[in-house]
Amino acid sequence: MARGGFPNMGGANMNNLMKQAQKLQQDMEKMQGEMEKKEFSATVGGGAVTAVANGKKQIVDIKIEPEVVDEDDIEMLEDLIMSACNEALKKAEEDTSSEVKRLTGGMNLPGMF
């Protein structure tokens, strides 16, 4: 290795690679900030329950229509809440994955999100 560089890689190529990595990091940080502001909602049970998740994959709101609250059937309400939350989180995950793929050109970078 000449001058501590990498074999068969010219200095210009390495500098170019480093610049691309820095740009990707900046773009990912920007995307994270934008994702935190996004909200994803899911409504189930014909409008009975709505859950809202943010881009950080946190549930930030749940709305329950009063007519679905039946003390004799709490299990149904629990199922509706769980279903709405899971669907909202799935939407957030899909959007995040789509944005990461767009930024990375489809490269698989484990642990990015």
Swiss-Prot record:
UniProt keyword Phosphoprotein, yes or no: no
Pfam families, sorted: YbaB_DNA_bd
Keywords, alphabetical: Cytoplasm, DNA-binding
Compartment(s): Cytoplasm, Nucleoid
Primary subcellular site in the record, as a coarse category: cytoplasm
GO annotation, cellular component aspect: bacterial nucleoid; cytosol
GO MF annotation: an example: DNA binding
Region listing for Disordered, in residue ranges: 93-113
InterPro entries hit by this protein: YbaB-like_sf, YbaB/EbfC
Biased composition (Basic and acidic residues): 93-102
Family: Belongs to the YbaB/EbfC family.
PANTHER family linked: NUCLEOID-ASSOCIATED PROTEIN YBAB (PTHR33449:SF1)
Subunit structure as annotated in this protein's UniProt entry: Homodimer.
Cited function: Binds to DNA and alters its conformation. May be involved in regulation of gene expression, nucleoid organization and DNA protection.
HAMAP family, alphabetized: DNA_YbaB_EbfC
Protein name: Nucleoid-associated protein CBO0032/CLC_0052
